[in-house]
Protein backbone atom coordinates (compact mmCIF):
# COMPACT_ATOMS: atom_id res chain seq x y z
CA UNK A 1 0.00 0.00 0.00
CA UNK A 2 1.42 3.36 -1.06
CA UNK A 3 0.34 6.73 0.32
CA UNK A 4 1.00 9.89 -1.71
CA UNK A 5 0.47 12.94 0.51
CA UNK A 6 0.10 16.55 -0.59
CA UNK A 7 2.87 18.21 1.41
CA UNK A 8 2.58 21.63 -0.23
CA UNK A 9 2.37 24.90 1.70
CA UNK A 10 -1.42 24.86 1.51
CA UNK A 11 -1.76 21.66 3.57
CA UNK A 12 0.38 22.64 6.55
CA UNK A 13 -2.60 22.87 8.92
CA UNK A 14 -4.14 19.66 7.60
CA UNK A 15 -0.98 17.57 7.69
CA UNK A 16 -1.52 16.17 11.22
CA UNK A 17 -4.88 14.77 10.06
CA UNK A 18 -3.24 13.18 7.02
CA UNK A 19 -0.56 11.68 9.23
CA UNK A 20 -3.22 10.28 11.57
CA UNK A 21 -5.05 8.79 8.58
CA UNK A 22 -1.92 6.92 7.49
CA UNK A 23 -1.25 5.77 11.04
CA UNK A 24 -4.73 4.32 11.47
CA UNK A 25 -4.49 2.59 8.11
CA UNK A 26 -1.15 0.99 8.94
CA UNK A 27 -2.49 -0.22 12.28
CA UNK A 28 -5.01 -2.41 10.42
CA UNK A 29 -2.43 -4.09 8.18
CA UNK A 30 -0.50 -7.32 8.55
CA UNK A 31 2.90 -5.78 7.90
CA UNK A 32 5.74 -8.08 6.93
CA UNK A 33 8.23 -8.85 4.18
CA UNK A 34 5.92 -11.50 2.71
CA UNK A 35 2.62 -9.87 3.67
CA UNK A 36 1.67 -6.17 3.62
CA UNK A 37 4.23 -3.60 2.56
CA UNK A 38 3.85 0.15 2.99
CA UNK A 39 5.42 3.22 1.43
CA UNK A 40 4.77 6.91 2.10
CA UNK A 41 5.72 9.77 -0.22
CA UNK A 42 5.13 13.50 0.25
CA UNK A 43 5.10 15.87 -2.69
CA UNK A 44 4.66 19.52 -3.60
CA UNK A 45 6.78 20.88 -6.44
CA UNK A 46 8.86 17.72 -6.15
CA UNK A 47 8.56 14.44 -4.26
CA UNK A 48 10.23 13.21 -1.08
CA UNK A 49 10.10 9.56 -0.03
CA UNK A 50 9.48 8.94 3.66
CA UNK A 51 10.19 5.24 3.11
CA UNK A 52 9.92 2.65 0.34
CA UNK A 53 7.92 -0.57 0.25
CA UNK A 54 10.96 -2.57 1.32
CA UNK A 55 12.46 -0.12 3.83
CA UNK A 56 10.66 -1.49 6.90
CA UNK A 57 9.24 -4.94 7.55
CA UNK A 58 7.51 -4.42 10.91
CA UNK A 59 4.44 -2.43 11.82
CA UNK A 60 6.14 -0.84 14.82
CA UNK A 61 8.95 0.56 12.66
CA UNK A 62 6.51 2.05 10.19
CA UNK A 63 4.30 3.56 12.89
CA UNK A 64 7.31 5.16 14.56
CA UNK A 65 8.30 6.85 11.30
CA UNK A 66 4.74 7.91 10.47
CA UNK A 67 4.24 9.50 13.89
CA UNK A 68 7.41 11.50 13.42
CA UNK A 69 6.74 12.69 9.86
CA UNK A 70 7.02 16.43 9.32
CA UNK A 71 5.23 18.50 6.72
CA UNK A 72 7.38 18.89 3.62
CA UNK A 73 6.22 22.30 2.39
CA UNK A 74 6.88 23.84 -1.00
CA UNK A 75 4.95 25.13 -3.98
CA UNK A 76 3.45 24.96 -6.51
CA UNK A 77 1.59 21.68 -6.19
CA UNK A 78 2.50 19.29 -9.01
CA UNK A 79 0.40 16.17 -8.62
CA UNK A 80 1.31 14.88 -12.06
CA UNK A 81 4.99 14.93 -11.16
CA UNK A 82 4.20 13.22 -7.85
CA UNK A 83 2.39 10.40 -9.62
CA UNK A 84 5.20 10.04 -12.14
CA UNK A 85 7.68 9.80 -9.29
CA UNK A 86 5.78 6.81 -7.93
CA UNK A 87 5.90 5.11 -11.32
CA UNK A 88 9.64 5.66 -11.67
CA UNK A 89 10.76 5.12 -8.09
CA UNK A 90 8.19 3.33 -5.92
CA UNK A 91 6.20 0.85 -8.00
CA UNK A 92 9.42 -0.89 -8.98
CA UNK A 93 10.91 -4.21 -7.94
CA UNK A 94 14.03 -2.51 -6.57
CA UNK A 95 11.84 -0.41 -4.25
CA UNK A 96 9.96 -3.45 -2.99
CA UNK A 97 6.94 -3.54 -5.30
CA UNK A 98 5.69 -7.04 -6.11
CA UNK A 99 3.50 -5.88 -8.98
CA UNK A 100 5.21 -8.20 -11.44
CA UNK A 101 4.51 -11.10 -9.05
CA UNK A 102 0.79 -10.41 -9.26
CA UNK A 103 0.39 -8.82 -5.82
CA UNK A 104 -2.28 -6.06 -5.97
CA UNK A 105 -0.83 -2.57 -5.70
CA UNK A 106 -2.91 -0.02 -3.76
CA UNK A 107 -2.36 3.72 -3.92
CA UNK A 108 -4.15 6.29 -1.76
CA UNK A 109 -3.60 9.92 -2.78
CA UNK A 110 -4.49 12.77 -0.41
CA UNK A 111 -4.77 16.13 -2.19
CA UNK A 112 -5.50 19.60 -0.83
CA UNK A 113 -5.55 21.69 -4.00
CA UNK A 114 -5.51 21.87 -7.78
CA UNK A 115 -2.44 20.64 -9.55
CA UNK A 116 -0.26 23.07 -11.47
CA UNK A 117 0.69 20.34 -13.92
CA UNK A 118 -1.19 17.75 -15.94
CA UNK A 119 -2.12 14.47 -14.28
CA UNK A 120 -3.49 12.69 -17.37
CA UNK A 121 -0.38 10.84 -18.56
CA UNK A 122 0.85 9.45 -15.21
CA UNK A 123 -2.70 8.65 -14.11
CA UNK A 124 -3.24 6.63 -17.29
CA UNK A 125 0.11 4.89 -16.85
CA UNK A 126 -0.79 3.82 -13.31
CA UNK A 127 -4.04 2.34 -14.58
CA UNK A 128 -2.19 0.46 -17.31
CA UNK A 129 0.17 -0.90 -14.63
CA UNK A 130 -2.83 -2.20 -12.71
CA UNK A 131 -2.35 0.08 -9.69
CA UNK A 132 -5.61 0.42 -7.75
CA UNK A 133 -5.77 4.14 -7.01
CA UNK A 134 -8.10 6.00 -4.66
CA UNK A 135 -7.93 9.82 -4.65
CA UNK A 136 -9.23 11.85 -1.71
CA UNK A 137 -9.33 15.64 -1.93
CA UNK A 138 -10.51 18.57 0.14
CA UNK A 139 -12.80 21.31 -1.11
CA UNK A 140 -9.77 23.08 -2.59
CA UNK A 141 -9.06 20.20 -4.97
CA UNK A 142 -10.44 19.62 -8.46
CA UNK A 143 -13.17 16.97 -8.64
CA UNK A 144 -12.39 16.05 -12.25
CA UNK A 145 -8.73 15.74 -11.38
CA UNK A 146 -9.54 13.35 -8.54
CA UNK A 147 -11.60 11.22 -10.91
CA UNK A 148 -8.80 11.11 -13.49
CA UNK A 149 -6.31 9.98 -10.87
CA UNK A 150 -8.55 7.28 -9.40
CA UNK A 151 -8.66 3.85 -11.00
CA UNK A 152 -12.40 4.39 -11.42
CA UNK A 153 -14.30 7.69 -11.04
CA UNK A 154 -16.23 6.07 -8.19
CA UNK A 155 -12.96 5.74 -6.27
CA UNK A 156 -12.66 9.54 -5.98
CA UNK A 157 -13.94 11.28 -2.89
CA UNK A 158 -14.10 14.83 -1.60
CA UNK A 159 -14.14 15.95 2.03
CA UNK A 160 -14.52 19.49 3.32
CA UNK A 161 -11.25 19.30 5.23
CA UNK A 162 -8.59 16.72 6.09
CA UNK A 163 -9.99 16.55 9.62
CA UNK A 164 -13.01 14.85 8.01
CA UNK A 165 -10.92 11.94 6.70
CA UNK A 166 -12.38 9.47 9.24
CA UNK A 167 -15.76 9.92 7.54
CA UNK A 168 -14.54 8.31 4.30
CA UNK A 169 -12.78 5.33 5.77
CA UNK A 170 -15.68 2.89 5.99
CA UNK A 171 -16.66 3.56 2.38
CA UNK A 172 -13.02 3.39 1.33
CA UNK A 173 -12.66 -0.02 2.94
CA UNK A 174 -15.77 -1.28 1.15
CA UNK A 175 -14.57 0.03 -2.20
CA UNK A 176 -11.12 -1.46 -1.73
CA UNK A 177 -12.58 -4.85 -0.86
CA UNK A 178 -14.67 -4.78 -4.02
CA UNK A 179 -11.76 -3.82 -6.25
CA UNK A 180 -9.38 -6.34 -4.70
CA UNK A 181 -11.89 -9.15 -5.15
CA UNK A 182 -12.18 -8.19 -8.82
CA UNK A 183 -8.42 -8.53 -9.37
CA UNK A 184 -7.70 -11.50 -7.11
CA UNK A 185 -8.02 -14.99 -8.64
CA UNK A 186 -9.32 -16.60 -5.44
CA UNK A 187 -12.77 -18.14 -5.29
CA UNK A 188 -14.87 -19.08 -2.32
CA UNK A 189 -13.12 -16.86 0.23
CA UNK A 190 -15.43 -15.22 2.74
CA UNK A 191 -14.21 -11.68 3.29
CA UNK A 192 -13.81 -10.27 6.77
CA UNK A 193 -11.95 -7.13 7.86
CA UNK A 194 -8.89 -9.25 8.66
CA UNK A 195 -9.03 -11.79 5.83
CA UNK A 196 -5.97 -11.60 3.55
CA UNK A 197 -7.39 -11.12 0.04
CA UNK A 198 -4.14 -11.81 -1.73
CA UNK A 199 -0.54 -12.36 -0.78
CA UNK A 200 0.71 -9.22 0.84
CA UNK A 201 -2.61 -7.42 0.90
CA UNK A 202 -5.21 -7.01 3.63
CA UNK A 203 -8.43 -5.04 3.63
CA UNK A 204 -8.51 -1.62 5.24
CA UNK A 205 -10.92 -1.19 8.14
CA UNK A 206 -11.04 2.06 10.05
CA UNK A 207 -13.60 3.71 12.31
CA UNK A 208 -16.26 5.77 10.48
CA UNK A 209 -17.74 9.05 11.71
CA UNK A 210 -20.54 11.35 10.61
CA UNK A 211 -18.77 14.28 8.97
CA UNK A 212 -19.84 15.51 5.49
CA UNK A 213 -18.40 13.54 2.63
CA UNK A 214 -19.09 13.60 -1.11
CA UNK A 215 -18.31 10.63 -3.35
CA UNK A 216 -17.71 12.11 -6.77
CA UNK A 217 -19.16 9.34 -8.91
Language model: regions and residue ranges:
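Eukaryotic intrinsically disordered and solvent-exposed regulatory patches
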Residues: 11-13, 24-28, 91-96, 118-123, ...
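Von Willebrand factor
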Residues: 1-108, 114-121, 135-144, 167
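Fold-core signature of tandem repeat domains
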Residues: 1, 26, 62, 66, ...
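DG-centered beta-turn motif at the end of beta-strands
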Residues: 4-7, 18, 40-43, 86, ...
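Von Willebrand factor A/integrin I-like adhesion domains
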Residues: 63-69, 123-134, 139-180
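Sec-exported extracytoplasmic/periplasmic mature domains
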Residues: 23-31, 58, 67, 71-74, ...
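Extracellular/luminal ectodomains of metazoan preproproteins built from arrays
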Residues: 1, 77-79, 100-101, 151, ...
Amino acid sequence: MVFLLDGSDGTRNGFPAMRDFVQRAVETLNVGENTDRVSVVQYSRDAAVQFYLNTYTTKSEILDIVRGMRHKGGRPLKTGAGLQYLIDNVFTASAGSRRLEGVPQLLIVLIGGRSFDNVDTPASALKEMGVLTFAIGTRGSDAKELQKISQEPSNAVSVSDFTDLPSVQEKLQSSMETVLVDVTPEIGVELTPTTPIAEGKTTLLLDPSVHPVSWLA
